[in-house]
Amino acid sequence: SLDGTYFEYKCADSSTGINTYGGSGYISENESPNFETLRWSLYRKLHYRPLSDFRFYSVKASNPSSFKFELREDAYIKQQLQTTPLLSYLLYEDGKIVIDEITPKDRFGDMFTVSSMLHSMSMGKSITSYLVGHAICDGTIESVDSRLNDWPLLEDTLYYNQKLINLLNMSSGDSAYTQKESNIAVLTRLATEFKGSKKSNLQYHYANLDTNIITTYLLFKYGDSGLKQLFDDVFGKKIRIKNEVWLNKHGAVNRYDQTLGHQFFATRYDYLRIAKAMLDDWQNDTCVGQYLKTIHERRIPKNGAQG
């Protein structure tokens, strides 16, 4: 792991075997994995995934924010932690954490702890959007209706001159090209397979590429040092991350490639810090809060997919 310690994965004596689902560790929603397969998948996510790409930048605050606690027991949550793959449950109400539960040792707690770095998955899309809100509020980007016509790499692709809101809504019309996810870097894909591409109907299509383009576009707009400063301002000074939050590159050939993904890594408490910052912006009607309300108002039908 990142701190130099290691966990030796061993199958239980009664193991019925591990299904690796192709070796990636990702299990689709329609599968019914056994307990050993779930543990193996978690092991991959905790100990392999954080190291699978070059890191762009990491941030933690010198004076992290703290939480107030007024804990109560919840029998249903405890039961779910004992019988399902649920790893962690935090409930924040009226300015306090009122439920704080984690997987027990005899389930996944020998691997997963309060300091484990969770892979953001789809939450990374929300965090990316939150950063876009800050970019709009500091004037780096004009608005959600700004057209992506100032980045030469997008020329002669379906993304050129589209409004930013289309990519935020994952409705850029790229469904013909993104049915399967790719580990190839954004810059490489735009310069090769997307040259001459044409957009289809601007309807919702859940994929990673739109968001990876947005993070890499932020890197183009700010520059390397400028985007790292934005991370310092948002995660360090505003949210006041305690442990660490970092963003990896995606498909980079070397550590100098200027191509980003949207997969963040943070602890369970630091994800709550991020969520609380979003809630505070919304409730206080800050500039970023107004941005959040705008994209909520401009959301599009998802045909029952992804909520």
Tell where the protein language model's regions lie, with residue ranges.
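N-terminal leader/targeting segments and the immediately adjacent pre-domain N-terminus
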Residues: S1-M111, D138-E142
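Glycine- and aromatic-rich loop/turn segments at beta-sheet edges
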Residues: E101-M111, N183-S200, R240-D257, N303-G304
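Solvent-exposed, acidic/flexible segments
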Residues: E70, D74, T84-P85, S116-G124, ...
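Penicillin-binding protein/beta-lactamase superfamily catalytic region
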Residues: K198, L202-Y204, Q229, L247-G307
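Active-site SXXK
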Residues: G95, S116-S143, L167, I214-L218, ...
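Active-site helix/loop module of the DD-peptidase/beta-lactamase fold
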Residues: D138-S172, G223-G261, A266, Q283
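Active-site-proximal loop and beta-strand segments within enzyme catalytic domains
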Residues: F67, I77-Q79, D110-S115, H119, ...
